[in-house]
Curated annotation (Swiss-Prot):
Propeptide residues per the UniProt entry: 20-43
Predominant subcellular localization, coarse grouping: secreted
Native organism: Conus ventricosus (Mediterranean cone)
Residues annotated with Methionine amide modification: 63
Signal peptide coordinates: 1-19
Keyword Secreted: yes
Protein name: Conotoxin VnMLCL-042
Gene Ontology CC, one term: extracellular region
Amino acid sequence: MLCLPVFIILLLLASPAAPNPLQTRIQSNLIRAGPEDANMKTDKRVISGLLAGILVPLIDAIMG
């Protein structure tokens, strides 16, 4: 009779400790992926497009 409450308490303690399978899979994928896989290089076309989008209207406004 004493085993049942002990079993229930152990079951309640063990349930939150179980890892989320999706979370562990994402974490393992992130660990395996290196920074070179993340494409951290800045694309020059993006920067030039942003600068052109900002500078051209600014120069047009200054010139009149």
